[in-house]
Amino acid sequence: MQGALSTPAELQRTFIATDDRHSLFYRELRAQLQTAGVQLVDSIAEATGTISILYDETDQRVLSVSARNVPTEYEVYYTVQYSIDGGGETLVEPQTLTLTRDYTYDPLLVLGKAREEEQLRAAVVKDLVRIVLKKISTL
């Protein structure tokens, strides 16, 4: 979607409201909006629109275990809730998105599996941001 985002006038100067400016989702959303030419501002007073990240959580859970009760498969999930306001009105009511990816786990390959988990989480974040950007382009 690089450079292909059509944004409404209400979002030409956008403030991203979040409690966690270090989350993977916030950083990826910010980077993709900047790439698309959206001017991001540091205060709500300067903004023509606001994207509010109301909830931002990621973790993993066990999907299956072996006969010895050792995890053999995990699921990485990422959940965000966001809303979009612009021009004094709500453009997008709060929406919750959850994406998951699963992977097999081998205790003998711990380092490789940790890297795989990071890559899956990054892919999930990119997909979540793509969904939000697509929603913005339909406004």
Annotated model-derived regions:
Residues L33-L40, I84-G88, P107, I131-L139:
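Sec/Tat-exported extracytoplasmic proteins
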Residues L108-L139:
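C-terminal/domain-edge helix-coil "capping" segments
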Residues E46, S52-T96, D102-E118:
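Surface-exposed short loop/turn segments
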Residues Q12, G49-T50:
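A generic secondary-structure signal marking the coil-to-beta-strand transition
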Residues M1-V38:
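A structural "domain/chain start" motif
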Residues V38-G49:
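Short acidic low-complexity segments
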Residues R30-T35, V70, E118-A122:
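Short alpha-helical linear motifs
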